[in-house]
């Protein structure tokens, strides 16, 4: 049985709609989250479909672990390097930022050269295949990641797009469609951005939630909050890639932007669905 959106039930009758919402929200299977979207407390239910998908992820990850263990070390390192380059090119491409594989390869060949554009982004992605741990616990941690990834690049492009608050932006920001229509307004004011990011980070670090789920939830919440003027997508994708590379096979983290780009319509539709007020935080 398909999990019907509350927004679909809304048009079938107010009584049925409210009853279904209350049943879901108060269900023993409901995980209620300490954060609200459009004034509704967020929650989710682990449906059979979601459980099956999570199981399939783990099965595929075991197969990937086995395959990579059988590849000679040098060949595997070369393949990881190729995947790293592809991920950086694609995460930029999604945002309309031009970068070439040649540029990224040159940075990888000389990581000490701090003068090249994209150096911060490349160096940060190298963490996916290293033992170094990155703290993602506080607003300051998120800001540090942004600084390492994108500060130099955005400063070079337009200093007005750099964050002007304690951690994030002070003013409003709109998310535009390809037709320049406003499809989402980032959270305001600065105090609310800081509060919601703290709540989102608490969810990300909640050990009672399955790791892949909390990574996905945080990815959505980051996009909803939209804490920066520029660089939100690339910062969010890096965080998700890094966390996936630590929870699953390293190569999984290098496939996120490809998966998003290949399913971009479905990806944006997912954001729109959760943003919809009639879905009441489901």
Model-identified regions with their sequence ranges:
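FIC/Doc superfamily catalytic core
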Residues: 1-282
């Amino acid at each position: 049985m398909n999990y019907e959106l509350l927004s679909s039930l809304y048009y079938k009758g107010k009584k049925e709609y409210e009853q279904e919402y209350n049943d879901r929200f108060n269900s023993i299977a409901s995980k209620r989250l300490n954060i609200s979207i459009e004034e509704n407390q967020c929650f989710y239910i682990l449906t059979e479909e979601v459980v099956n998908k999570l199981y399939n992820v783990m099965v595929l990850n075991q197969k990937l672990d086995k395959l990579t263990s059988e590849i000679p070390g040098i060949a595997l390192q070369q393949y990881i390097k190729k995947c790293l380059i592809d991920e950086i090119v694609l995460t930029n491409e999604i945002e309309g930022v031009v970068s070439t594989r040649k540029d990224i390869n040159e940075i990888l060949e000389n990581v000490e050269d701090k003068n090249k554009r994209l150096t911060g982004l490349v160096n940060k992605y190298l963490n996916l295949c290293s033992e170094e741990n990155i703290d993602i616990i506080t607003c300051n941690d998120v800001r540090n990641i942004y600084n390492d990834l994108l500060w130099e690049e955005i400063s070079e492009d337009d200093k007005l797009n750099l964050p002007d608050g304690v951690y994030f932006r002070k003013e409003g920001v709109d998310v535009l469609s390809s037709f320049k229509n406003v499809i989402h307004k980032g959270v305001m004011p600065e105090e609310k951005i800081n509060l919601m990011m703290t709540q989102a980070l608490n969810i990300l670090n909640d050990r009672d939630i399955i790791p892949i789920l909390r990574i996905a939830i945080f990815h959505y919440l980051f996009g909803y909050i939209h804490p920066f003027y520029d660089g939100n997508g690339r910062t969010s994708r890096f965080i998700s890639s890094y966390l996936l590379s630590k929870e699953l096979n390293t190569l999984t983290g290098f496939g996120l932007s490809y998966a998003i780009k290949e399913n971009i319509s479905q990806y944006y539709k997912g954001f729109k669905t959760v943003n919809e007020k009639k879905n009441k935080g489901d």
